[in-house]
Swiss-Prot record:
Pfam families: Snf7 (PF03357). This is Vacuolar-sorting protein SNF7. GO terms for cellular component: cytoplasmic side of plasma membrane; cytosol; ESCRT III complex; multivesicular body. Residues 175-210 are annotated as: Disordered.
Length: 220
């Protein structure tokens, strides 16, 4: 627990010791790798000796095999040691990563706390109310500016609509009256037809005049 707390309190010795431990373990792993390479070569050499003396010098061949077996056992031990060191390196790196992650998370939490220190739900609501109020005022001002004005005369939209409807009705009435009206003049007729009709009309006038004269005489 104290190791974890050292990260939060800002102590550098724990993080530096973790890095030093990882560096030391990796150096040891490098040495073991070189040792493994050396032993592998020795095993190959002893195997060659055993094969070369398998039929001619069995005692030497057996000695080579025993030496080969000893190198193999040593190689197995080194492999086990390497596995242990690699596991330890991974564990330290994982713990170091977790600790660094926790440090970053703590800094983030502190930053959020600092940001929210002056913020409250009530304050946010009040600010939003002010914003909405100003937006409403802006809209009212925009509407007032966009409405047409003329020498202080306030235009009633309803009155204008009624006047427009009256004009439309007047035009409609004029059209209907024009459809019912008889034309004031007739189309011109040919000269011959006009002359004949005039003669008939004159005869009718003479007859009416004679009739009126006769009625006057009878009345006397």
């Amino acid at each position: 627990m104290s190791g974890w707390m050292s990260y939060f309190t800002g102590r550098k010795d724990t993080r530096e010791s973790a890095r030093d431990a990882i560096v030391g373990l990796r150096q040891q792993l490098l040495m073991l790798e070189k040792k493994e390479e050396f032993l592998q070569k020795k095993i190959e050499e002893e195997m060659k000796k055993a094969k070369a003396n398998a039929t001619g010098n069995k005692r030497l061949a057996m000695a080579a095999l025993r030496q080969k077996k000893a190198h193999e056992n040593e190689l197995d031990r080194i492999a086990g040691t390497r596995l242990t060191l690699e596991t330890q390196v991974n564990a330290i790196e994982s713990a170091n990563l977790n600790a660094e992650t926790m440090v970053a998370m703590k800094k983030g939490a502190d930053a959020l706390k600092g940001i929210h220190s002056n913020l409250t739900a009530e304050g946010v609501d009040a600010t939003m109310d002010k914003i909405r109020e100003q937006m409403d005022l802006t809209n009212d001002i925009s509407d007032a500016i966009s409405n047409p004005v003329g020498m202080g005369i306030v235009l009633d939209e309803d009155d204008l609509k009624e006047e427009l409807e009256a004009l439309e009705q007047e035009q409609l009435d004029d059209r209907l009256a024009g459809a019912d009206r008889v034309p004031s003049h007739l189309p011109a007729s040919p000269v011959g037809q006009t002359t004949g009709r005039a003669a008939v009309e004159e005869d009718e006038d003479d007859e009416e005049a004679q009739l009126r004269k006769l009625q006057a005489e009878l009345a006397m």
